UniProtKB/Swiss-Prot annotation:
One Pfam family in the UniProt entry: QueF
Keywords carried by this UniProt record: Cytoplasm, NADP, Oxidoreductase, Queuosine biosynthesis
PANTHER family: NADPH-DEPENDENT 7-CYANO-7-DEAZAGUANINE REDUCTASE
Location(s), subcellular: Cytoplasm
Function statement: Catalyzes the NADPH-dependent reduction of 7-cyano-7-deazaguanine (preQ0) to 7-aminomethyl-7-deazaguanine (preQ1).
Protein name: NADPH-dependent 7-cyano-7-deazaguanine reductase
Classification lineage: Bacteria, Bacillati, Bacillota, Bacilli, Bacillales
Gene label: queF
InterPro entries: GTP-CH-I_C/QueF, NADPH_dep_7-cyano-7-deazaG_red, QueF, QueF_type1
Length: 165
């Protein structure tokens, strides 16, 4: 199989762009996609994002997290540099941890219409408590909906050792 052609990547404008602008306000419109060349099979794509930051909506203090995004694509896939810039746009966004994870998941669902997706944020402790919100989605009426239910029921069954991340 040959590699991707330039015409296959016409919607990918940020990758390789040396004039990238970093946005400091929540910006879902920065997300870009490219075609999934393997729509006939299920496979996971996982992003490990260890430098996520946002702001507490009440105090304005910074929150830090590692975010894990896993999805099974259908026709479209998110381009990683656009995802990086999108996550960076949360830097001055004030929202609770749980809201940030759900917003990210909802934006990616709207962008790609994946078969399945999960987003898990592992936030560093503040005030002696770490918060690890997890959300997922499986396309309704499909095996992926059942998969989402199963993964939710079995999520995080075993306590972990928290070592201040």
């Amino acid at each position: 199989m040959a590699g991707r052609l330039d015409e296959d990547l016409k919607d990918v404008t940020l990758l390789g762009n040396q004039n990238t602008k970093y946005l400091f306000e929540y910006s879902p419109e920065i997300l870009e996609t490219f075609d999934n060349n393997h729509p006939n099979r299920d496979y996971f794509v996982k992003f490990n994002c260890p430098e996520f930051t946002s702001l507490c909506p009440k105090t304005g203090q910074p929150d830090f997290a590692t975010i894990y995004i896993s999805y099974i694509p259908e026709k479209k896939m998110v381009e990683s540099k656009s995802l990086k810039l999108y996550l960076f746009s949360f830097r001055n966004h004030g929202d609770f941890h749980e809201d940030c994870m759900n917003v990210i998941m909802n934006d990616l669902i709207e962008l790609m219409d994946p078969r399945y997706i999960e987003v898990w944020g592992k936030f560093t402790p503040r005030g002696g408590i770490s918060i690890d919100p997890y959300c997922n989605y499986g396309r309704p009426g499909t095996k992926y909906e059942k998969m989402a239910e199963y993964r939710m029921m079995n999520h995080d069954l075993y306590p972990e050792t928290v070592d201040n991340r």
